[in-house]
């Protein structure tokens, strides 16, 4: 495995739903059966926050605002080590399928069941108190 770590940024995109916060998941590019958060590379000169917003736009057609930093996860894929820095992104948009990906909005429990990877489930659990506070119904 390479000693270099590939830095990426991801977005936990949320919006207010009729019965509580809704969480956006998209299918993976390499494996369309995997459900994940929008994420990807950080362009040269781009901040992690801006990269997270760009990935949400590119992969799900959603424009939003970074509301909080959620945390980071690391994983190995092939011969590389990745570190993904996640941000909670709020939006009032529904998005549109892009880049050959499907997208779905889920409640918290449904998102936990649908997410493919344990690391993503752990990240959602960590971010959930912040999401609930941000999208508290008035």
Regions found by a protein language model. Name each.
Residues 9, 40, 54, 106-109:
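Structural detector for helix-capping/boundary residues
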Residues 1-37:
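N-terminal strand-loop-strand
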Residues 65, 72-100, 104-108, 119, ...:
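Active-site-adjacent beta-strand/loop module that shapes the phosphate/pyrophosphate-binding cleft
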Residues 37-70:
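The catalytic Nudix box helix
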